[in-house]
Amino acid sequence: MAVSKFVQIRRDLHKIPEIGFKEWKTQQYILDYIGTLSNEHVEVKVWRTGVIVKVKGKNPEKVIGYRADIDGLPITEETGYEFASVHEGMMHACGHDLHTTIGLGLLTAAVTERIDDDLVFLFQPAEEGPGGALPMLESEELKEWKPNIILGLHIAPEYPVGTIATKEGLLFANTSELYVDLKGKGGHAAYPHTANDMIVAASHLVTQLQSVISRNVNPLDSAVITIGKITGGTVQNIIAEKSRLEGTIRTLSVESMSRVKSRIEAIVAGIEASFQCEAVIDYGAMYHQVYNHEALTREFMQFVSEQTDMKVITCTEAMTGEDFGYMLQEIPGFMFWLGVNSEYGLHHAKLRPDEEAIEKAIVFLDQYVKWKGTRK
């Protein structure tokens, strides 16, 4: 059965997931598609592995921005799709193929029927890490076209197609990666008294970290520390000289993030003293909370509820991390969840979003942008 133009675009993109700042094929695909739309009203800039596109308005008073993240994840796909990833060990497991497709659909509509205001589309690399939103925001390429209003979306497997979910104010958490490297003294398993076991040190550290949230953060102010990976040792009869812990920190307030990091540093210092080892902490990529502009979000929710076919749900904040939060620090705007009704969740190897959501999103966002960017 033939599929629609934009479903096919999504499938094309799904085949070529690429990690942050290496999205060369994705960038070229976007540029090639934009080339089919180009006219005197369309301007294109390349920023690293991303693309910035401006559609000139007929009588602009402001700039409306749409941001789509374009990178994939280092996950081996298990969807069974005929159009599964052709890049081994890589997958679009967070819906960025849909985000990008919806952006191209909205761009197509904008070129076909121009509005009064300027539109800027940000096809942003590296959302999954190391973070592309902040450097794109600070780039010379964007300064001239910086939006006055910006919006973004994220697919939501748990919501049905035809539904969006968002809220005023805090939507997504502050997030930080966490890496701790421990170094002691290795040795033979038969002579533990001559060595300094970093497997044991790492085990104690993981256990002690469990008290950081439960005893240092207000229970009404949610926070999470997860250690997702521990490595150490080389063979079963050698005491490990080194170990490494990798995890994530998520909080719903900046104050809690600061407090949690302070406690982690104190506990790691205690591990150093207790086990006579060296420890190095690296917080890796850190993302600012996604905080929706109250008035714009309220207006958007009302418009979608009253003037489109989409159902609007007021959701609660989530511990999800998104570097779009940096853009919302500087530009009034909002992010929302788009229902795609998948049995499997984000970052799962079997994530299968319902493609019907693509056309629905393009249609209702085009309605909103035309309403917001046209003089009444």
UniProtKB/Swiss-Prot annotation:
GO biological process, one term: lysine biosynthetic process via diaminopimelate
SUPFAM superfamilies attached to this UniProt entry: Bacterial exopeptidase dimerisation domain, Zn-dependent exopeptidases
Pfam families: M20_dimer, Peptidase_M20
Keyword Ubl conjugation: no
EC supergroup of this enzyme: hydrolase
Active site: 69, 128
The UniProt record lists the keyword Heme: no
Biological or metabolic pathway of the protein: Amino-acid biosynthesis; L-lysine biosynthesis via DAP pathway; LL-2,6-diaminopimelate from (S)-tetrahydrodipicolinate (acetylase route): step 3/3
Domain of life: Bacteria
Enzyme Commission identifier(s): 3.5.1.47
Stored NCBIfam families: amidohydrolases
PANTHER family found in the cross-reference section: N-ACETYLDIAMINOPIMELATE DEACETYLASE (PTHR11014:SF98), PEPTIDASE M20 FAMILY MEMBER (PTHR11014)
Job of this protein: Catalyzes the conversion of N-acetyl-diaminopimelate to diaminopimelate and acetate.
Protein name: N-acetyldiaminopimelate deacetylase
